[in-house]
From Swiss-Prot:
This is 2-C-methyl-D-erythritol 4-phosphate cytidylyltransferase. The record marks 149, 203 as: Positions MEP for the nucleophilic attack. Belongs to the IspD/TarI cytidylyltransferase family. IspD subfamily. Its EC number is 2.7.7.60. One of its GO terms (biological process) is isopentenyl diphosphate biosynthetic process, methylerythritol 4-phosphate pathway. It comes from the Bacteria.
Length: 219
């Protein structure tokens, strides 16, 4: 089985509040995005790693890191960025993993768990159990109901797809309100498997998240 990974690293990270996009900040000795690249590169079946970055970073990164991955140019939206990465995937690739560069703590074990499930079901997504009580709220600000937390999961990445399925999903126009890749496949009326991650895999969104990730990596 030959697999590819698309690392989405083209976001501006406005909520983080830094002049340098968070995925390129130094995190315990290496750029944030490189932690994810190395996690996928440690798995032999991943023959191709594509990092989608802002257009002004493509040449710089291609020269700085001449082996290990190739760069694709990011688009205006995440959908466009992943689609640009998808265009570089080889014809012999069986499964494609899409992963957020801002989740640098992803473990080899969790990648393999999601990949194993995807190999059986064609699509699998990393998830974590919802920890907080979740309320359904009306447009005018009133609580309609409390959702059953035991069946709620927070979607993470990687999200791993049979190649032809992801390409088919991305050949269609993105629907309004689509927030992740698996939703595109759901729109094809295809069941998506959920795999609970075993290790910390949070997304770096704030400076507090960054500091926590640094503490974990140094411990």
């Amino acid at each position: 089985m030959k697999n590819a990974a698309i690392i989405a690293a083209a976001g501006s990270g406005k909520r983080f509040g830094s002049r340098v996009s968070k995925q390129f900040l130094n995190l315990s000795g290496k750029p944030v995005f490189l932690w994810s690249v190395e996690a996928f590169a440690s798995i032999k079946s991943f023959k191709q790693i594509i990092v989608v970055v802002p257009s002004d970073m493509v040449e710089f990164l291609s020269l700085k890191y001449k082996t290990g991955f190739v760069c694709a140019t990011g688009g205006n939206e995440r959908f466009d960025s992943v689609k640009n990465g998808l265009a570089l995937v080889g014809d012999d690739i069986d499964f494609i993993a899409v992963h957020d560069a801002s989740r640098p703590l992803i473990s080899k074990k969790d990648i393999l768990l999601v990949l194993e499930k995807a190999a059986k079901t064609k699509v699998a997504v990393a998830v974590e159990k919802a920890k907080d009580t979740v309320k359904l709220v009306s447009a005018d600000g009133y609580i309609l109901k409390t959702l059953d937390r035991t069946i709620l999961r927070n979607a993470q990445t990687p999200q791993i797809f049979k190649t032809e399925l992801l390409k088919r999903a991305y050949s269609r126009k993105m629907s309004a309100g689509t927030t992740d890749d698996s939703q595109l496949v759901e729109n094809l009326k295809i069941k998506v498997s959920a795999v609970e991650t075993k290790f910390l895999n949070f997304k770096i969104t704030t400076k507090q998240d960054f500091e926590l990730a640094e503490k974990i990596l140094k411990s």
